[in-house]
């Protein structure tokens, strides 16, 4: 059966995906050993990015591999409602229409968001399909669907009853742009240019003052103390005295607290308990009053006196000017300091004292810590275990309420008569305490990550005891990025143990961060993002998948250059053309068992190499070394199958050995396409179904098993020697400018079988092979080993004198070019500071130069020798 002359992914990809869905290949059978994964649900805020593409590719490689290994695979898909991100996106859209959320009732606004959600859920689904994800769409879930909403309500109520959820007034992170509280993990901290302001605080009743230093002079309006370290001799005399707050006149105590760092600034700290987390803790320890100076828009409120109505930035400028005018400002120092910004909109986050709902995390963390410490849950690579544990040891309570409309509304109804909180899975009719029907539901919604934390079991039907939950929970692996270890991974582990009494997954594979070719993080501001959908459109899904897999080395960020996609599109073309060549030579094919007695050296070699490749790829996939697995099949298919075996047997296809060669080709190609399938599903399905030995679909074909009788170390060694001899002959041709079409004469000191000589003549374009006792004059060394020495005669092909002169100049040029790499490798700063892959790349370039120089110098030596 023939195929088209060129590989066109657009003609085959969606055709096969629709076929797979129709055949229900991605729906688990319910029999055999189980293997389950839940997809990290992408946000419904737009298009997927290259990080998603990598994540999906890795999960699909695992799913397809396990499916072919006979596992009952469930890869469960879904999407996340993404509270802040989605509401922000919708509000941004409304602003282009001249409207805001406040122009609508809550229900009207939620209708708009649901329409948005349904549209983008379908778009994201189509995008995931275009990558080739073998997820079971019949089990697709959404973090706001009714089943998950039921699970969320039950978890909230159960945790409240256990005392794990409580409401309290605490310092929280407030984003005034998003109009909501953020968890600690949703705040990104950056070093930014700022200033340290030194300000005099007069001591009451004395002609003295204490100088404090602060980066936020505007918050002094809410100061309720000055703190110093108890062992700081400079300030011991002030402890217990009263300071007068400049501009405000408030009397505030000078206190001693161990939190204060005597080496920072002046060693005296202004304490603003309502607007700083650490100050809040100091305030609690010393029973200080809490003065809140900001409203929800971070505008100064009535507690700010004459500065009321100013933004934080305006107030800072005005306060500093007033301090200077009244003689309180001592000096201003430039400095860098850490500034917290909203992870969604990059707005500066303001610590505020607010009533919020919290989860008590310490009780939940205990088992989740033990699970990772004892290996019940493992991280790959292992270094992420330490990152996880360090965070868990220091875990703080989680603020779960958000001042949004889009999300899971908190299932709490406060009685408007007695104030009691009625916490219920369903809307209560009356207050459980006083019987009043005057109830009002909490306006806030839950943090998006609250519902996401339940994802592994809520998606399988919990709290009902469903067959899916019984069979597929716990899942086998979670594939995710390091940036959500705290947001999501840790919380899933805690919730899994709390509500399922079982881990949610056995392994956590932390994949690479996708960066640009220079190692920079992809971002809109840099304009260096690569759109996976554009890549698929130009190169095809399979080349993109293979590129991501072959670059996915454990422990390293993935540096992506668009040229890589072209490289692996060429690989796809190579696979296509090799299959086409085989199919064109199968018109009289008859399947027979491959008998070792009828095989030639090249047959034995390729069959043995195939078994080694099967073993290495299987081991690599089992250990999540996707780059190693991809490299193995790439090298085997292109270098060994195409460049050597197919070239070696072309003549034999015209002889009585045709049937043997056909069967070896079909077997090796069949197994190779199966090995390639997890990486390049569309291409392999298109080609595999054309083979005379194919079955129903490569999706459900058996993963190749090692045929021990085909492993032949001796044949591998012998054929490797032939390859090195032929490479040596080709290298000499290249170095002395002898065209590949010109036949050369060779001399051999040693022994070669007739079969080996035929390979050398055919693949090396050799006219004759003469056996000699010593190296002839005017010949170049192609190969030397303990068994054989091979030389190429150059006497009639070149002018020796001019060739030696040319080669010497070439050596000088190569040495000059190599020098820049040598200098880099001698530079301690380069070796210490350059990324590891850049250092290795430099070493490799130097090695290649050294090899080429050594080859040419050997040819020069051979040409100059007289015997």
From Swiss-Prot:
Give compartment(s): Cytoplasm
Q: Which InterPro entries match?
A: aa-tRNA-synth_I_CS (IPR001412), aa-tRNA-synth_Ia (IPR002300), Anticodon_Ia_Val (IPR033705), M/V/L/I-tRNA-synth_anticd-bd (IPR013155), Rossmann-like_a/b/a_fold (IPR014729), tRNA-bd_arm (IPR010978), tRNAsynth_Ia_anticodon-bd (IPR009080), Val-tRNA_synth_C_sf (IPR037118)
Is S-adenosyl-L-methionine included in the keywords of this UniProt record? Answer: no
- Among the Pfam families in the record, one is Val_tRNA-synt_C
Q: Motif location ('HIGH' region)?
A: 42-52
Instruction: State its Enzyme Commission number(s).
Output: 6.1.1.9
Q: What GO molecular function annotation could you give as one example from this UniProt entry?
A: ATP binding
Q: Where is this motif: 'KMSKS' region?
A: 521-525
Residue ranges that the Swiss-Prot or TrEMBL entry lists as coiled coil: 794-867
Q: What is known of its domains?
A: ValRS has two distinct active sites: one for aminoacylation and one for editing. The misactivated threonine is translocated from the active site to the editing site. The C-terminal coiled-coil domain is crucial for aminoacylation activity.
> What organism does the record attribute this protein to?
Fervidobacterium nodosum (strain ATCC 35602 / DSM 5306 / Rt17-B1)
**Organism placement in taxonomy:** Bacteria, Thermotogati, Thermotogota, Thermotogae, Thermotogales
Which gene codes for it?
A: valS
| Name under which the protein is recorded | Valine--tRNA ligase
Superkingdom field: Bacteria
Q: Which family, according to UniProt? A: Belongs to the class-I aminoacyl-tRNA synthetase family. ValS type 1 subfamily.
List UniProt keywords, sorted A-Z.
Aminoacyl-tRNA synthetase, ATP-binding, Coiled coil, Cytoplasm, Ligase, Nucleotide-binding, Protein biosynthesis
Please give the function described in this protein's UniProt entry.
Answer: Catalyzes the attachment of valine to tRNA(Val). As ValRS can inadvertently accommodate and process structurally similar amino acids such as threonine, to avoid such errors, it has a 'posttransfer' editing activity that hydrolyzes mischarged Thr-tRNA(Val) in a tRNA-dependent manner.
The reactions it catalyses are:
tRNA(Val) + L-valine + ATP = L-valyl-tRNA(Val) + AMP + diphosphate
> Which positions in this protein are listed as binding ATP?
524
What the entry lists under PROSITE patterns is as follows: AA_TRNA_LIGASE_I (PS00178)
């Amino acid at each position: 059966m023939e195929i088209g002359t060129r590989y066109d992914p657009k003609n085959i990809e969606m055709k096969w995906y629709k076929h797979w869905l129709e055949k229900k290949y991605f729906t688990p059978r319910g029999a055999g050993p189980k293997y389950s994964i839940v997809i990290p649900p992408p946000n419904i805020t737009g298009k997927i990015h290259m990080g998603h593409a990598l994540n999906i590719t890795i999960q699909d490689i695992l799913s397809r591999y396990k499916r072919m290994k006979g596992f009952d695979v469930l890869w469960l898909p879904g999407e996340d409602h993404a509270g802040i991100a989605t509401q922000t996106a919708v509000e941004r859209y409304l602003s282009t229409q001249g409207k805001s959320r406040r122009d609508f009732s809550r229900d009207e606004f939620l209708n708009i968001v649901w329409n948005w959600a349904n549209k983008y859920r379908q778009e994201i689904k189509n995008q995931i399909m275009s990558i080739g994800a073998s997820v079971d769409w019949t089990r697709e879930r959404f973090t706001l669907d009714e089943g998950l909403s039921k699970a969320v309500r039950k978890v909230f109520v159960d945790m409240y009853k256990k005392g794990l959820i409580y409401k309290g007034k605490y310092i929280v992170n407030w984003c005034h742009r998003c109009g909501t509280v953020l968890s600690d993990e949703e705040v990104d901290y950056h070093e930014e240019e700022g200033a340290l302001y030194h300000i005099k605080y007069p001591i009451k009743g004395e002609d003295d003052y204490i100088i404090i230093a602060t980066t936020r002079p505007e918050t002094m309006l809410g100061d309720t103390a000055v703190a110093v370290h108890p062992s700081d001799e400079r300030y011991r005399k002030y402890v217990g005295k009263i300071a007068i707050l400049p501009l405000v006149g408030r009397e505030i105590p000078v206190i001693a607290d161990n939190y204060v760092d005597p080496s920072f600034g002046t060693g005296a700290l202004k304490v603003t308990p309502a607007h700083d987390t650490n100050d809040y803790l100091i305030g609690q320890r010393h029973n200080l009053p809490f003065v809140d100076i900001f409203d929800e828009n971070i505008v100064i409120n009535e507690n700010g006196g004459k500065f009321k109505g100013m933004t934080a930035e305006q107030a800072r400028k005005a306060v500093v000017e007033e301090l200077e005018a009244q003689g309180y400002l001592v000096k201003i120092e430039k400095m860098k300091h850490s500034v917290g910004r909203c992870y969604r909109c990059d707005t500066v986050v303001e610590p505020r004292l607010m009533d919020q709902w919290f989860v008590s995390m310490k009780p939940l963390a205990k088992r989740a810590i033990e699970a990772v410490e004892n290996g019940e849950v493992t991280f790959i690579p292992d270094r992420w275990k330490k990152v996880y544990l360090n965070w868990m040891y220091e875990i703080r309570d989680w603020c779960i309420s958000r001042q949004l409309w889009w999300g899971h509304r908190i299932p709490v109804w406060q009685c408007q008569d007695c104030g009691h909180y009625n916490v219920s899975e369903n809307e209560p009719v009356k207050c459980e305490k006083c019987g009043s029907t005057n109830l009002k539901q909490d306006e806030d919604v839950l943090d998006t990550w609250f519902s996401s934390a339940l994802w592994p079991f809520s998606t399988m039907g919990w709290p009902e005891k469903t067959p899916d939950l019984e069979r597929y929970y716990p899942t086998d692996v979670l594939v995710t990025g390091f940036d959500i270890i705290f947001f999501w991974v840790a919380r899933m582990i805690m919730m899994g143990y709390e509500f399922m009494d079982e881990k949610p997954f056995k392994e956590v594979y932390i994949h690479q961060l996708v960066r640009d070719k220079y190692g920079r993080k992809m971002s809109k501001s840099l304009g260096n993002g690569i759109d996976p959908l554009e890549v698929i459109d130009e190169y095809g899904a399979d080349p993109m998948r293979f590129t991501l897999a072959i670059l996915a080395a454990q422990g390293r960020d993935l540096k992506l250059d668009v040229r890589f996609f072209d490289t692996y599109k060429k690989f796809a073309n190579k696979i296509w053309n090799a299959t086409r060549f085989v199919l064109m030579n199968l018109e009289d094919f008859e399947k027979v068992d491959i008998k070792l007695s009828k095989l030639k050296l090249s047959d034995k070699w390729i069959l043995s190499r195939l078994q080694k490749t099967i073993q290495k790829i299987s081991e690599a996939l089992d250990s999540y070394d996707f780059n190693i697995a991809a490299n193995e099949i790439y090298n085997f298919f292109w270098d060994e199958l195409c460049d050597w075996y197919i070239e070696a047997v072309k003549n034999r296809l015209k002889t009585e050995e045709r049937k043997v060669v056909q069967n070896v080709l079909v077997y090796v190609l069949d197994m190779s396409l199966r090995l390639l399938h997890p990486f390049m599903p569309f291409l392999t399905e298109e080609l595999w179904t054309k083979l005379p030995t194919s079955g129903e679909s490569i999706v459900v074909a058996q993963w190749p098993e090692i045929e021990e009788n085909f492993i032949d170390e001796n044949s591998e060694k012998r054929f490797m020697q032939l390859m090195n001899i032929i490479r040596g002959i080709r290298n000499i041709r290249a170095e002395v400018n002898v065209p590949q079409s010109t036949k050369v004469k060779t001399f051999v000191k040693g022994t070669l079988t007739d079969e080996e000589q035929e390979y050398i003549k055919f693949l090396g374009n050799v006219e004759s092979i003469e056996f000699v006792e010593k190296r002839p004059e005017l010949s170049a060394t192609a190969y030397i080993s303990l068994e054989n020495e091979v030389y190429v005669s150059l006497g009639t092909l070149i002018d020796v004198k001019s060739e030696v002169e040319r080669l010497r100049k070439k050596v000088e040029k190569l040495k000059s070019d190599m020098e820049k790499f040598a200098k880099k490798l001698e530079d301690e700063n380069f070796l210490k500071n350059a990324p590891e892959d850049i250092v290795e790349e430099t070493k490799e370039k130097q090695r290649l130069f050294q090899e080429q120089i050594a080859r040419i110098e050997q040819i020069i030596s051979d040409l100059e020798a007289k015997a």
